[in-house]
Regions:
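Short polar catalytic/cofactor-binding loops
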Residues: 7-13
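C-terminal beta-strand edge segments of enzyme domains
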Residues: 209-300
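CN hydrolase (nitrilase-like) catalytic-core segments centered on the catalytic cysteine
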Residues: 59-80, 148, 157-243
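Extreme N-terminal starter segment of soluble prokaryotic enzymes
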Residues: 1-4
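Short beta-strand scaffold segments in enzyme catalytic cores
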Residues: 81-83, 97-100, 140-142, 223-225, ...
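Active-site catalytic loop in hydrolytic enzyme cores
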Residues: 89-169, 182-186, 191, 258-261
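Cys-nucleophile CN-hydrolase/nitrilase-fold catalytic domain and related Cys-dependent amidase chemistry
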Residues: 14, 22-104, 110, 181-196, ...
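Short, acidic/polar
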Residues: 16-25, 158-164
Length: 301
């Protein structure tokens, strides 16, 4: 089953980004891909919130979104908009929303990013996604030609409980469109995505933003496809482009037969915490070391 990943350096104009995506979708369809994947914030990357807000709209009034719905229907291809900012009617904050469009031009699924990127990096970069966005509340699974697909976005990948829930639901594919910073990408990107694939025995598809953006932000790139064994099938490096890869969907069954993590999975109760009074009593009565006696956790000569 052939898929196409679009690694982008999105700019501050949604319609320019949408035009780039339309060309890529058409090429993906011509190359025989059944599904096209774009990164997080595919339609807009802009740190200037006031400037960016003038482009915000709900789904029916987003010209960029409607243009992508039309091109998906024209080329009869599944389209995964990794994410885009959506201002739902009456909402004070935006949703960072992943949207899947079916080949008939209907929206098959929506997922709002659950974990918002509020961090202070050692490099000096500070991010407060929650200042403009509201986190989603619900994991989403959608049926696609690739099988059952669990949706997530970028920072979500650091929270394994979400993927445990997806694994319990029997997903075959996980999507993780992203816009990683360079420092966190160099340190964690490949490791996290391979871990999510291995623990779920599922394909992981992660289209990414890359290079230096119009607003000055730099993103890591390295869009990845990882198979259920944890092998990297595609790594797009650090420049924008479109790439296709063929997935052997039978690999899901083979891996799960070899290492049946789903069948062996147990419901884990909360751990028993140590009784602090009992622990203190043990420390208080523990006797002699080479240098003296431990009394209430302190070393005395």
């Amino acid at each position: 089953m052939r898929i196409a990943l679009h690694q982008m350096t999105s700019c501050i104009d949604p319609m320019r980004n949408a035009s780039d995506m339309q060309d890529a979708i058409a090429k993906a369809a011509d190359d025989g891909a059944v599904m096209y994947f774009a990164p997080e914030m595919a339609l807009l990357v802009d740190r200037d919130r006031a400037r960016a807000r003038k482009y915000m709209a709900d789904e029916p009034h987003s010209m960029a979104l409607q243009s992508l719905i039309a091109v998906a229907a024209r080329h009869r291809i599944w389209v995964h908009i990794g994410s885009m900012p959506i201002l739902d009617d009456g909402a004070e904050k935006l949703a960072n929303r992943s949207i899947i469009i079916s080949p008939d031009g209907t929206i098959a699924a929506r997922y709002d990013k659950m974990h918002l990127f509020d961090v202070d990096l050692a490099s000096g970069e500070t991010w407060r996604e929650s200042s403009a966005y509201v986190g989603g509340e619900q994991p989403v699974v959608v049926q696609t030609p690739l099988g059952q697909m669990g949706l997530a976005i970028c920072y979500d990948m650091r929270f394994p409980d979400l993927f445990s829930a997806y694994a319990k639901s029997g997903v075959d594919v996980l999507t993780l469109p992203s816009a990683f910073t360079v420092p966190t990408g160099e340190a964690h990107w490949h490791t996290l995505l391979r871990a999510r694939a291995i623990e779920s025995a599922a394909f992981v598809i992660a289209a990414a933003q890359c290079d230096v953006h119009e607003d000055g932000r730099q993103t890591y790139g390295h869009s990845l496809v990882v198979d259920p064994w944890g092998s990297i099938l595609l790594d797009m490096g650090d420049l924008p482009g479109l790439a296709c890869v063929d997935l052997d969907l039978d690999a899901i069954k083979r891996v799960r037969q070899q290492i049946p993590v789903h069948a062996n999975r147990r419901n884990i109760p909360s751990p028993l915490l140590p009784n602090k009074s009992a622990l203190r009593a043990i420390l208080c009565t523990r006797s002699s070391t080479l240098f003296g006696k431990i009394i209430c956790g302190r070393l005395h000569p």
